[in-house]
Amino acid sequence: MVFAKALIGRKIQKNVRVEIEEGYIRKVEVTNERVQIPGILIPSFVDTHAHYLPYSLSLTRPRLDGIGDLKSALDFIAENVKKVPHNVIIMEGFDDSKWERSLTREDLDRITERPLVVRRVCGHKAVLNTSAIKILKERFGKIPNLNEETGLAVEDLPLALSKYFPPSEEEIEDAIIRAEDLLISMGIWVVGENASIRYLRKLVEMDRAGVLKIRWRVAVYFNQIDEAKEIIKYESENFRVVGIKEFLDGSVGARTAAFSRGYTDGGNGKLLKSDEELEKIMKTAESLNLGVWWHAIGDLAIDQALRVLKRSKKPEIHRIEHFEFPREEHYKMAADMGVKLSLQPNFVRRWGEIGGLYHRALGEVFFWGNRFRLLENLKANYAFGSDTMPPGPIYGLLGALHHPIKEERLGLEEALYRYTTAGAEIFGEREFGEIAPGKKALITIITEDFNP
Protein backbone atom coordinates (compact mmCIF):
# COMPACT_ATOMS: atom_id res chain seq x y z
CA MET A 1 0.00 0.00 0.00
CA VAL A 2 1.14 3.55 -0.76
CA PHE A 3 0.56 6.05 2.01
CA ALA A 4 0.45 9.82 1.54
CA LYS A 5 2.87 10.24 4.44
CA ALA A 6 4.63 8.03 6.99
CA LEU A 7 6.73 8.64 10.08
CA ILE A 8 10.02 6.92 9.25
CA GLY A 9 12.41 7.19 12.18
CA ARG A 10 12.04 10.78 13.32
CA LYS A 11 10.97 12.23 9.95
CA ILE A 12 7.70 12.30 8.02
CA GLN A 13 8.28 11.09 4.45
CA LYS A 14 5.85 11.53 1.53
CA ASN A 15 4.55 8.83 -0.82
CA VAL A 16 5.71 5.79 1.12
CA ARG A 17 5.05 2.22 0.07
CA VAL A 18 4.82 -0.19 3.00
CA GLU A 19 4.51 -3.93 2.42
CA ILE A 20 3.22 -6.11 5.25
CA GLU A 21 3.29 -9.89 5.35
CA GLU A 22 2.09 -12.15 8.17
CA GLY A 23 1.95 -9.28 10.63
CA TYR A 24 5.45 -7.96 9.91
CA ILE A 25 6.70 -5.03 7.85
CA ARG A 26 8.67 -6.46 4.94
CA LYS A 27 9.47 -3.43 2.82
CA VAL A 28 9.46 0.37 3.19
CA GLU A 29 10.33 2.70 0.32
CA VAL A 30 9.57 6.17 -1.02
CA THR A 31 7.82 5.86 -4.38
CA ASN A 32 6.28 7.88 -7.21
CA GLU A 33 3.22 5.62 -7.32
CA ARG A 34 -0.28 6.99 -6.79
CA VAL A 35 -1.25 7.45 -3.14
CA GLN A 36 -3.81 4.89 -2.01
CA ILE A 37 -4.28 5.93 1.64
CA PRO A 38 -4.38 9.55 2.89
CA GLY A 39 -3.22 10.77 6.29
CA ILE A 40 -0.02 9.91 8.14
CA LEU A 41 1.02 6.32 8.81
CA ILE A 42 2.73 6.07 12.20
CA PRO A 43 3.85 3.32 14.54
CA SER A 44 1.26 2.42 17.16
CA PHE A 45 0.72 5.09 19.76
CA VAL A 46 2.29 4.03 23.06
CA ASP A 47 0.58 5.51 26.11
CA THR A 48 3.41 5.21 28.63
CA HIS A 49 1.45 6.17 31.74
CA ALA A 50 -2.25 5.48 32.11
CA HIS A 51 -5.13 4.28 34.25
CA TYR A 52 -7.43 2.84 31.61
CA LEU A 53 -8.80 0.10 33.85
CA PRO A 54 -10.18 2.30 36.66
CA TYR A 55 -11.16 4.85 34.01
CA SER A 56 -13.17 2.23 32.13
CA LEU A 57 -14.80 1.18 35.40
CA SER A 58 -15.67 4.84 36.02
CA LEU A 59 -17.54 4.96 32.70
CA THR A 60 -20.24 2.85 34.36
CA ARG A 61 -20.71 5.66 36.90
CA PRO A 62 -21.96 9.24 36.48
CA ARG A 63 -19.05 11.42 35.28
CA LEU A 64 -18.80 15.17 35.66
CA ASP A 65 -16.50 15.72 32.66
CA GLY A 66 -16.75 19.18 31.16
CA ILE A 67 -18.90 20.71 33.91
CA GLY A 68 -17.51 24.22 34.30
CA ASP A 69 -19.12 25.63 37.45
CA LEU A 70 -20.23 24.56 40.92
CA LYS A 71 -23.97 25.05 40.41
CA SER A 72 -24.02 22.90 37.28
CA ALA A 73 -22.03 20.24 39.13
CA LEU A 74 -24.48 20.18 42.03
CA ASP A 75 -27.43 20.02 39.62
CA PHE A 76 -25.77 17.11 37.79
CA ILE A 77 -25.09 15.24 41.02
CA ALA A 78 -28.65 15.76 42.28
CA GLU A 79 -30.13 14.51 39.01
CA ASN A 80 -27.89 11.45 38.76
CA VAL A 81 -28.17 10.34 42.39
CA LYS A 82 -31.64 9.11 41.47
CA LYS A 83 -30.27 6.93 38.67
CA VAL A 84 -27.66 4.97 40.67
CA PRO A 85 -29.07 1.67 41.97
CA HIS A 86 -26.16 0.84 44.32
CA ASN A 87 -26.29 1.70 48.01
CA VAL A 88 -23.02 3.65 47.78
CA ILE A 89 -23.06 6.28 45.03
CA ILE A 90 -19.73 7.00 43.36
CA MET A 91 -19.33 9.77 40.80
CA GLU A 92 -16.15 10.62 38.93
CA GLY A 93 -14.23 13.19 36.97
CA PHE A 94 -15.04 16.63 38.39
CA ASP A 95 -12.56 19.41 37.64
CA ASP A 96 -12.98 22.34 40.01
CA SER A 97 -10.03 24.32 38.67
CA LYS A 98 -12.30 27.05 37.24
CA TRP A 99 -15.07 26.95 39.86
CA GLU A 100 -15.59 29.66 42.48
CA ARG A 101 -14.96 26.96 45.13
CA SER A 102 -14.88 23.19 45.39
CA LEU A 103 -17.48 20.74 46.64
CA THR A 104 -18.02 20.24 50.38
CA ARG A 105 -19.61 17.66 52.63
CA GLU A 106 -22.50 20.04 53.30
CA ASP A 107 -23.17 20.42 49.56
CA LEU A 108 -23.49 16.66 49.20
CA ASP A 109 -25.50 16.25 52.42
CA ARG A 110 -28.13 18.60 50.99
CA ILE A 111 -28.48 16.34 47.96
CA THR A 112 -28.84 12.88 49.51
CA GLU A 113 -28.68 10.88 52.73
CA ARG A 114 -27.32 7.88 50.82
CA PRO A 115 -23.51 7.42 50.95
CA LEU A 116 -22.03 9.62 48.20
CA VAL A 117 -18.40 9.94 47.03
CA VAL A 118 -17.38 12.32 44.24
CA ARG A 119 -13.80 11.93 42.99
CA ARG A 120 -11.80 14.60 41.19
CA VAL A 121 -10.40 13.89 37.72
CA CYS A 122 -6.80 13.75 39.03
CA GLY A 123 -7.65 10.86 41.38
CA HIS A 124 -5.88 12.58 44.29
CA LYS A 125 -8.95 14.27 45.77
CA ALA A 126 -12.53 13.28 46.63
CA VAL A 127 -15.42 14.76 48.57
CA LEU A 128 -17.73 12.63 50.73
CA ASN A 129 -21.06 13.24 52.40
CA THR A 130 -21.75 12.39 56.04
CA SER A 131 -23.27 8.99 55.24
CA ALA A 132 -20.22 7.93 53.23
CA ILE A 133 -17.88 9.03 56.03
CA LYS A 134 -19.96 7.08 58.55
CA ILE A 135 -19.96 3.84 56.54
CA LEU A 136 -16.19 4.08 55.98
CA LYS A 137 -15.51 4.61 59.69
CA GLU A 138 -17.67 1.61 60.55
CA ARG A 139 -15.78 -0.61 58.09
CA PHE A 140 -12.21 0.70 58.34
CA GLY A 141 -11.91 3.01 61.34
CA LYS A 142 -10.08 6.29 60.87
CA ILE A 143 -9.30 7.05 57.21
CA PRO A 144 -5.95 8.77 56.55
CA ASN A 145 -6.13 12.31 55.13
CA LEU A 146 -9.93 12.53 55.42
CA ASN A 147 -11.24 15.76 56.92
CA GLU A 148 -14.59 14.76 58.38
CA GLU A 149 -15.67 18.37 58.82
CA THR A 150 -15.30 19.36 55.16
CA GLY A 151 -15.66 15.87 53.66
CA LEU A 152 -12.40 16.39 51.74
CA ALA A 153 -10.18 13.33 51.27
CA VAL A 154 -6.80 13.55 49.57
CA GLU A 155 -4.33 10.90 48.41
CA ASP A 156 -5.10 7.70 50.38
CA LEU A 157 -8.84 7.21 49.90
CA PRO A 158 -9.31 8.67 46.40
CA LEU A 159 -6.26 6.83 45.05
CA ALA A 160 -7.43 3.52 46.55
CA LEU A 161 -11.17 3.93 46.07
CA SER A 162 -11.54 0.36 44.80
CA LYS A 163 -10.07 -0.92 48.08
CA TYR A 164 -12.74 0.86 50.08
CA PHE A 165 -15.57 0.16 47.63
CA PRO A 166 -14.40 -2.91 45.67
CA PRO A 167 -15.87 -3.72 42.24
CA SER A 168 -17.00 -7.25 41.44
CA GLU A 169 -14.95 -9.68 39.34
CA GLU A 170 -17.45 -9.19 36.53
CA GLU A 171 -17.04 -5.41 36.69
CA ILE A 172 -13.24 -5.77 36.52
CA GLU A 173 -13.41 -8.05 33.48
CA ASP A 174 -15.87 -5.72 31.79
CA ALA A 175 -13.53 -2.79 32.50
CA ILE A 176 -10.64 -4.60 30.79
CA ILE A 177 -12.75 -5.40 27.72
CA ARG A 178 -14.04 -1.83 27.58
CA ALA A 179 -10.50 -0.44 28.01
CA GLU A 180 -9.09 -2.51 25.16
CA ASP A 181 -11.87 -1.43 22.82
CA LEU A 182 -11.21 2.21 23.75
CA LEU A 183 -7.45 1.87 23.30
CA ILE A 184 -7.76 0.24 19.89
CA SER A 185 -10.19 2.94 18.75
CA MET A 186 -7.50 5.54 19.52
CA GLY A 187 -4.68 3.70 17.73
CA ILE A 188 -2.98 2.59 20.95
CA TRP A 189 -1.67 -0.99 20.88
CA VAL A 190 0.74 -0.64 23.80
CA VAL A 191 -0.12 0.84 27.19
CA GLY A 192 1.78 1.45 30.42
CA GLU A 193 -0.88 0.77 33.03
CA ASN A 194 -0.73 1.48 36.74
CA ALA A 195 -2.60 -1.57 38.00
CA SER A 196 -3.78 -2.76 41.41
CA ILE A 197 -3.55 -6.44 42.29
CA ARG A 198 -7.09 -7.47 41.34
CA TYR A 199 -6.71 -5.96 37.87
CA LEU A 200 -3.33 -7.69 37.51
CA ARG A 201 -4.82 -11.07 38.35
CA LYS A 202 -7.67 -10.59 35.92
CA LEU A 203 -5.30 -9.47 33.14
CA VAL A 204 -3.22 -12.62 33.61
CA GLU A 205 -6.34 -14.79 33.70
CA MET A 206 -7.63 -13.25 30.47
CA ASP A 207 -4.20 -13.48 28.83
CA ARG A 208 -3.98 -17.17 29.65
CA ALA A 209 -7.42 -17.55 28.07
CA GLY A 210 -6.05 -15.85 24.94
CA VAL A 211 -8.50 -12.95 24.91
CA LEU A 212 -6.26 -9.90 25.46
CA LYS A 213 -5.87 -7.84 22.30
CA ILE A 214 -3.22 -5.25 23.16
CA ARG A 215 0.14 -5.21 24.93
CA TRP A 216 -0.14 -4.36 28.62
CA ARG A 217 3.07 -3.16 30.26
CA VAL A 218 2.13 -2.66 33.88
CA ALA A 219 3.50 -1.27 37.12
CA VAL A 220 2.42 -2.83 40.42
CA TYR A 221 1.97 -0.66 43.50
CA PHE A 222 4.71 -1.20 46.07
CA ASN A 223 2.26 -1.83 48.90
CA GLN A 224 0.96 -4.84 46.94
CA ILE A 225 4.34 -6.24 45.94
CA ASP A 226 4.13 -9.35 48.14
CA GLU A 227 0.75 -10.29 46.65
CA ALA A 228 2.12 -9.75 43.14
CA LYS A 229 5.27 -11.93 43.39
CA GLU A 230 3.85 -14.75 41.24
CA ILE A 231 2.31 -12.35 38.75
CA ILE A 232 5.67 -10.62 38.29
CA LYS A 233 7.11 -13.95 37.13
CA TYR A 234 4.42 -14.29 34.45
CA GLU A 235 5.29 -12.87 31.04
CA SER A 236 3.79 -13.05 27.56
CA GLU A 237 3.58 -10.96 24.41
CA ASN A 238 0.51 -9.16 25.72
CA PHE A 239 1.32 -8.90 29.43
CA ARG A 240 4.42 -8.02 31.41
CA VAL A 241 5.07 -6.35 34.75
CA VAL A 242 7.78 -3.76 34.10
CA GLY A 243 7.80 -1.52 37.16
CA ILE A 244 6.97 -0.77 40.79
CA LYS A 245 4.85 2.33 41.37
CA GLU A 246 5.11 4.72 44.30
CA PHE A 247 3.88 8.25 44.97
CA LEU A 248 6.38 10.87 46.10
CA ASP A 249 3.77 13.64 46.15
CA GLY A 250 0.23 14.39 44.98
CA SER A 251 -1.33 16.75 42.42
CA VAL A 252 -1.54 20.49 41.83
CA GLY A 253 -5.34 20.37 41.66
CA ALA A 254 -5.51 18.79 45.11
CA ARG A 255 -2.71 21.12 46.36
CA THR A 256 -0.73 18.04 47.43
CA ALA A 257 2.14 18.18 44.90
CA ALA A 258 5.29 19.11 46.85
CA PHE A 259 6.98 22.44 46.03
CA SER A 260 9.86 24.42 47.49
CA ARG A 261 7.77 27.56 46.95
CA GLY A 262 4.23 27.78 48.27
CA TYR A 263 0.97 27.71 46.35
CA THR A 264 -0.48 31.16 45.75
CA ASP A 265 -3.45 30.24 47.97
CA GLY A 266 -1.32 28.72 50.74
CA GLY A 267 0.58 25.52 51.55
CA ASN A 268 3.46 23.74 49.84
CA GLY A 269 2.29 20.14 49.62
CA LYS A 270 4.49 17.52 51.26
CA LEU A 271 6.71 14.59 50.43
CA LEU A 272 4.96 11.28 51.07
CA LYS A 273 8.03 9.09 51.63
CA SER A 274 11.47 9.44 53.18
CA ASP A 275 14.64 8.94 51.16
CA GLU A 276 15.25 5.73 53.09
CA GLU A 277 11.83 4.36 52.18
CA LEU A 278 12.40 5.18 48.52
CA GLU A 279 15.81 3.55 48.52
CA LYS A 280 14.23 0.38 49.90
CA ILE A 281 11.63 0.45 47.11
CA MET A 282 14.36 1.01 44.52
CA LYS A 283 16.43 -1.91 45.80
CA THR A 284 13.35 -4.15 45.85
CA ALA A 285 12.63 -3.23 42.23
CA GLU A 286 16.20 -3.89 41.15
CA SER A 287 16.21 -7.28 42.91
CA LEU A 288 13.20 -8.21 40.77
CA ASN A 289 14.82 -6.79 37.61
CA LEU A 290 12.21 -4.02 37.50
CA GLY A 291 12.41 -0.24 37.41
CA VAL A 292 10.64 2.12 39.78
CA TRP A 293 7.86 4.36 38.51
CA TRP A 294 8.01 7.37 40.81
CA HIS A 295 5.14 9.84 40.64
CA ALA A 296 6.77 13.25 41.11
CA ILE A 297 5.08 16.50 40.08
CA GLY A 298 6.47 19.27 42.29
CA ASP A 299 10.12 20.29 42.33
CA LEU A 300 10.65 18.92 45.86
CA ALA A 301 9.44 15.48 44.79
CA ILE A 302 11.51 15.57 41.60
CA ASP A 303 14.57 16.62 43.59
CA GLN A 304 14.01 13.69 45.97
CA ALA A 305 13.51 11.23 43.11
CA LEU A 306 16.76 12.24 41.43
CA ARG A 307 18.64 12.34 44.73
CA VAL A 308 17.68 8.75 45.55
CA LEU A 309 18.20 7.50 41.98
CA LYS A 310 21.78 8.78 42.17
CA ARG A 311 22.38 5.98 44.67
CA SER A 312 21.49 3.36 42.05
CA LYS A 313 24.18 1.71 39.94
CA LYS A 314 21.73 1.65 37.02
CA PRO A 315 19.49 4.74 37.19
CA GLU A 316 18.67 4.36 33.50
CA ILE A 317 16.27 1.45 34.23
CA HIS A 318 14.11 3.66 36.44
CA ARG A 319 11.36 6.16 35.61
CA ILE A 320 9.97 9.41 36.91
CA GLU A 321 6.30 9.85 36.14
CA HIS A 322 5.03 13.33 35.19
CA PHE A 323 8.23 15.31 35.98
CA GLU A 324 6.05 18.38 35.65
CA PHE A 325 7.75 21.21 37.53
CA PRO A 326 11.48 20.52 37.78
CA ARG A 327 13.93 23.25 38.53
CA GLU A 328 16.39 24.11 35.75
CA GLU A 329 19.11 21.86 37.15
CA HIS A 330 16.74 18.90 37.35
CA TYR A 331 16.27 18.80 33.58
CA LYS A 332 20.00 18.45 32.98
CA MET A 333 20.45 16.01 35.85
CA ALA A 334 17.74 13.68 34.54
CA ALA A 335 19.16 13.81 31.02
CA ASP A 336 22.72 13.16 32.19
CA MET A 337 21.62 10.19 34.34
CA GLY A 338 19.59 8.67 31.51
CA VAL A 339 16.52 8.36 33.74
CA LYS A 340 13.34 7.53 31.82
CA LEU A 341 10.68 10.23 31.95
CA SER A 342 6.97 9.86 31.20
CA LEU A 343 5.41 13.27 30.53
CA GLN A 344 1.79 14.26 29.95
CA PRO A 345 1.38 16.97 27.29
CA ASN A 346 -2.39 16.81 27.79
CA PHE A 347 -1.84 18.45 31.20
CA VAL A 348 -0.31 21.40 29.35
CA ARG A 349 -3.37 21.73 27.17
CA ARG A 350 -5.88 21.21 29.98
CA TRP A 351 -4.35 23.13 32.89
CA GLY A 352 -1.21 24.76 31.49
CA GLU A 353 -2.46 27.85 29.69
CA ILE A 354 -1.58 31.34 30.90
CA GLY A 355 -4.21 32.10 33.56
CA GLY A 356 -5.10 28.41 33.91
CA LEU A 357 -4.98 26.17 36.97
CA TYR A 358 -1.20 25.80 37.05
CA HIS A 359 -0.51 29.48 36.53
CA ARG A 360 -3.05 30.58 39.15
CA ALA A 361 -1.94 27.99 41.71
CA LEU A 362 1.83 28.28 41.24
CA GLY A 363 2.60 31.81 40.11
CA GLU A 364 6.11 32.07 38.66
CA VAL A 365 6.78 28.37 39.30
CA PHE A 366 4.38 27.73 36.42
CA PHE A 367 7.16 28.69 34.00
CA TRP A 368 9.40 25.87 35.28
CA GLY A 369 7.08 23.21 33.94
CA ASN A 370 6.84 20.87 30.97
CA ARG A 371 9.76 22.30 29.00
CA PHE A 372 9.63 19.92 26.07
CA ARG A 373 12.06 21.86 23.87
CA LEU A 374 14.65 21.93 26.64
CA LEU A 375 14.29 18.15 27.03
CA GLU A 376 14.82 17.74 23.29
CA ASN A 377 17.92 19.91 23.36
CA LEU A 378 19.31 17.91 26.29
CA LYS A 379 18.55 14.63 24.48
CA ALA A 380 16.62 13.41 27.52
CA ASN A 381 15.11 9.92 27.51
CA TYR A 382 11.43 10.85 27.59
CA ALA A 383 8.13 9.77 26.08
CA PHE A 384 4.51 10.83 26.31
CA GLY A 385 1.53 9.34 28.10
CA SER A 386 -1.98 10.55 28.91
CA ASP A 387 -2.56 9.54 32.56
CA THR A 388 -6.08 9.07 31.12
CA MET A 389 -6.87 12.77 31.72
CA PRO A 390 -8.38 12.67 29.16
CA PRO A 391 -7.55 9.34 27.52
CA GLY A 392 -5.86 9.26 24.16
CA PRO A 393 -2.88 10.86 22.43
CA ILE A 394 -4.41 13.43 20.06
CA TYR A 395 -5.49 15.82 22.84
CA GLY A 396 -1.98 15.59 24.31
CA LEU A 397 -0.24 16.10 20.98
CA LEU A 398 -2.01 19.43 20.72
CA GLY A 399 -0.55 20.38 24.10
CA ALA A 400 2.96 19.72 22.78
CA LEU A 401 2.39 21.47 19.43
CA HIS A 402 0.68 24.53 20.92
CA HIS A 403 2.51 24.88 24.23
CA PRO A 404 1.64 28.27 25.79
CA ILE A 405 5.36 29.08 25.93
CA LYS A 406 6.28 29.19 22.25
CA GLU A 407 9.94 28.41 22.90
CA GLU A 408 8.96 25.02 24.40
CA ARG A 409 6.76 23.84 21.52
CA LEU A 410 7.60 20.69 19.59
CA GLY A 411 7.20 20.14 15.88
CA LEU A 412 4.80 17.47 14.65
CA GLU A 413 7.56 14.96 13.88
CA GLU A 414 9.06 15.38 17.34
CA ALA A 415 5.73 15.08 19.13
CA LEU A 416 4.68 11.99 17.17
CA TYR A 417 8.05 10.36 17.85
CA ARG A 418 7.59 10.91 21.59
CA TYR A 419 4.14 9.29 21.52
CA THR A 420 5.24 6.30 19.43
CA THR A 421 8.83 5.12 18.99
CA ALA A 422 10.14 6.75 22.17
CA GLY A 423 7.41 5.00 24.16
CA ALA A 424 8.35 1.61 22.76
CA GLU A 425 12.00 2.31 23.61
CA ILE A 426 11.16 3.27 27.18
CA PHE A 427 9.56 -0.17 27.60
CA GLY A 428 12.62 -1.82 26.07
CA GLU A 429 10.64 -3.11 23.08
CA ARG A 430 12.65 -4.04 20.01
CA GLU A 431 10.06 -5.97 18.00
CA PHE A 432 7.85 -2.96 17.27
CA GLY A 433 7.83 0.82 17.55
CA GLU A 434 9.12 1.78 14.09
CA ILE A 435 7.96 1.61 10.50
CA ALA A 436 10.93 -0.41 9.31
CA PRO A 437 11.54 -3.82 7.70
CA GLY A 438 11.45 -6.65 10.20
CA LYS A 439 9.32 -4.80 12.74
CA LYS A 440 5.92 -6.00 13.92
CA ALA A 441 3.21 -4.13 12.02
CA LEU A 442 1.70 -2.36 15.03
CA ILE A 443 0.67 0.75 13.11
CA THR A 444 -2.07 3.32 12.88
CA ILE A 445 -3.13 6.18 10.59
CA ILE A 446 -3.94 9.71 11.71
CA THR A 447 -5.26 12.80 9.96
CA GLU A 448 -3.20 15.96 9.61
CA ASP A 449 -5.58 18.27 11.46
CA PHE A 450 -3.72 19.45 14.55
CA ASN A 451 -5.32 22.83 15.02
CA PRO A 452 -5.84 23.81 18.68
Regions found by a protein language model. Name each.
Residues T284-W293, L300-I302, L306-H318, F323, ...:
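His/Asp/Glu-enriched, well-ordered alpha-helical/loop segment
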Residues E21, L248, K439:
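A cytosolic small-molecule/anion-sensing beta-strand core signal
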Residues D207-G210, I231-F239, E286-S287, K313, ...:
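Acidic (Asp/Glu)-rich catalytic clusters
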Residues H51, F239-T256, V339-R349, S386:
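Non-cysteine beta-strand/loop elements that form the S-adenosyl-L-methionine
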Residues K11-K14, F239-R240, G428:
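Short, small/polar residue-rich loop motifs at catalytic or cofactor-binding pockets
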Residues I214-K245, I317-E324, H359-E376:
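Phosphate/diphosphate-binding loops
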